[in-house]
Amino acid sequence: MAGHTGTDHTGPDHTDASHSGAVRIGTSGWSYDHWEGVLYPPGLPGRDRLAHYAARFDTVELNASFYRWPRAETFAGWRRRLPEGFAMSVKAPRGLTHGKKLYAPEVWAERITRCWHELGDKRAVLLVQLPPDFARDDARLDYFLAALPGWIRVSVEFRHPSWDDAGVYALLERHGAAYCVMSGAGLPCVLRATAPFVYVRLHGPDPDVLYGGSYSDDDLRWWAGRIGEWRAAGKDVFAYFNNDGGGSAVRNAATLRGLLGESLPW
């Protein structure tokens, strides 16, 4: 089916399957003008969009941090304003991932850690997206992951095919970091769980346009099955739709939540 062709790898079980994991479904970003009439009422001020979003979903992936990392005070503000039970994942800055390609990460690791403290109980996962021209470098990835405190949950999204290797999975497992499961636009879909949690990014089913198209009901049922399996194995799952065009991400996230038996407050 569209959006989930790839390789199904199984990995060691790091979790207690005697209890189910928690599932959070949301979108990548929230401040889109073209979501008016889909998620936001017409004329809703931009400053009110996150609160409106958080009344309907329990997680979001912050993408603006990739382009400009927020101040620690901004993270503290989100901690105060977001409702109880809400969790925000944050995309690592491109200066670290694309500019330096994880080289000499100490300054960024300290800054991220300080902001993670400020986000407090609203923090979810740090997404580290590596660029497509960054080929496999185990030593550099190992050094970067070791530079972060172990209590920060990290997921790594690889775009170069050389990273698809058992040695890389073992490295992630040693650090408790999650291999980012991807869907869409020719990206490899590897169903590999390397941490006590699973991180999924759904970039859209259009084979030619990244972030394009809307997942079919069959696609979403397939993903509900995979997420249900991870949940039954005791793994927490964070899944974010990145096909924001036309509000497809909102609709797909709501449908997937319903398929997983998650109540919808709207």
Model-derived features with residue positions:
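Residues lining hydrophobic/aromatic ligand-binding pockets adjacent to catalytic sites
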Residues: 1-266
